[in-house]
């Protein structure tokens, strides 16, 4: 991650992130930096609000509609920086997820595709965030792909459907695009139930990466782990075989792991979702090693099973009226001890960071509120907003990860002085946590016992309110000097 001073300065951050972008003309590079700086100062605002100068605004619209500028060019320096940082770590989680970007309120934008149940239009976005496991430090985007949903042709046959590229293949493309880690570095792909595809898991191993995914498919398994990935005969593993020992008989994943006894227990904090509040769940855990047998069609695996460690986490006594938690996790990382099993669970729990990133992109950067003429123009804007949303996560982490650290050690002195006045705390004693909540209160956050951490809207509304006050202080200082 960049040092805090670079992250905190919109101009320094924009120059560091976009100053090396290759757009065929140095003037375009300068324009990219200028637009990114304006966006970084107030990410949730509209382009006219971010660029009040009419000439600068017109130049920005021309930039976003220039065919010679692409999303891939704009995002490339950020991806390269993230990869360089991820190559320095011993272990990195590559957390992957898909989200829908909805432009239903902008019906005149051309080139978009169907999303949801088909009644709305927009595009899909696959993001892979690089995160350090222990500290949860967000290094940046390792890969990102915006794409359009392709409706199935009318009258499509079963064979044609099998040959057509599937939307789910974006998970495999991401693994291929990221590739193999350097020697001595472990990259671990983390995904939810949508990532439970045999082809995705196989692709991770082909790229010498590991994985932790939540199981969705009740696959055929056996316990012949000593045979590793030795090919199994086509179709034979999908039916019981007479005359073979019980260990060699195919079984189903969920039935097997739900028969394992608990070997540990722990309290786990669950992040809030759209349907549920944040809570602490008391869970138990069991784990073991199995072989996942390949699908019947064989093409994705050449008949080779995958040896995986399976970790089941479940809530034996959930609160009344609350659905019990159960995660069945598959990992390629050898798991021999209880401590290692809990660590794999902790890796999976880091998944919320990519969801938070997408929320930051939508709420913190108002990506769905942007009104441009075409999907291609929106892609170019995404090339500027995607790293901006990473910066929002990193800005928040500066205060969250060191709550008792003095705010003056990580934030500009003048900003700390303004917040200290608002919080009615001496600037020299203001901690990062106090500063964080004082800024959020400026955005309407009410800190109650039942309240979770500040949301994107209140946090950034407060941040920009403080920035406005700070600009007023600077202006008043200049006027007094004159």
Residue ranges and their predicted role:
Residues 2-110, 117-124, 129-482:
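Single, function-defining residue in the core of a domain
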């Amino acid at each position: 991650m960049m040092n805090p001073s670079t992250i905190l300065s919109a101009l320094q951050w924009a120059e560091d992130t976009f100053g090396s972008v290759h757009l065929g003309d140095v003037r375009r590079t300068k324009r990219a930096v200028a637009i990114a700086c304006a966006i970084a100062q107030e990410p949730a605002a509209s382009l006219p609000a971010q660029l009040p100068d009419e000439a600068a605004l017109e130049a920005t619209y021309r930039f976003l509609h220039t065919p010679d500028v692409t999303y891939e060019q704009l995002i490339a320096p950020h991806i390269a920086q993230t990869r360089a940082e991820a190559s320095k770590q011993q272990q990195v989680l590559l957390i992957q997820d898909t989200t829908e970007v909805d432009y239903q309120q902008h019906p005149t934008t051309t080139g978009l595709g169907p999303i949801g149940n088909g009644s709305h239009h927009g595009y899909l976005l696959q993001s892979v965030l690089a995160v350090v496991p222990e500290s949860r430090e967000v290094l940046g985007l390792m890969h990102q792909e915006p794409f359009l949903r392709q409706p199935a042709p009318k009258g499509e046959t079963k064979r044609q459907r099998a040959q057509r590229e599937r939307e789910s293949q974006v998970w495999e493309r991401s693994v291929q695009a990221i590739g193999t880690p350097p020697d001595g570095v472990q990259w671990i792909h983390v995904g939810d139930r949508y990532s439970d595809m045999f082809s995705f898991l196989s692709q991770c191993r082909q790229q010498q990466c590991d994985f932790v995914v939540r199981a969705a498919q009740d696959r055929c398994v056996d316990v012949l782990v000593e045979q590793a990935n030795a090919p199994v005969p086509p179709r034979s593993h999908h039916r019981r075989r007479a005359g073979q020992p019980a260990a060699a008989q195919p079984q189903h994943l969920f039935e097997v792991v739900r028969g394992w006894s608990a070997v540990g227990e722990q309290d786990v904090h669950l992040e809030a979702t759209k349907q549920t509040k944040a809570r602490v769940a008391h869970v138990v855990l069991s784990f073991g090693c199995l072989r996942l047998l390949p699908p019947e069609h064989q093409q994705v695996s050449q008949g080779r099973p995958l040896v995986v460690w399976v970790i089941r986490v479940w809530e034996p006594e959930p609160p009344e009226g609350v659905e019990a938690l159960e995660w069945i996790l598959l990992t390629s990382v050898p798991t021999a001890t209880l401590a290692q099993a809990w660590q794999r669970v902790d890796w999976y729990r880091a998944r919320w960071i990519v969801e938070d990133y997408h929320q930051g992109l939508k709420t913190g950067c108002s990506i769905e509120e942007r009104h441009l003429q075409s999907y291609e123009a929106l892609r170019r804007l995404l090339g500027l907003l995607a790293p901006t949303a990473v910066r929002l996560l990193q800005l928040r982490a500066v205060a969250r990860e060191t709550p008792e650290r003095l705010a003056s050690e990580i934030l500009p002195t003048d900003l700390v002085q303004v917040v200290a006045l608002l919080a009615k705390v001496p600037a020299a004693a203001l901690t990062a946590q106090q500063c964080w909540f004082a800024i959020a209160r400026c955005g309407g956050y009410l800190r109650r016992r039942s309240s979770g951490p500040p949301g994107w809207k209140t946090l950034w509304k407060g941040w920009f309110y403080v920035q406005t006050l700070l600009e007023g202080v600077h202006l008043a200082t200049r006027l007094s000097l004159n």
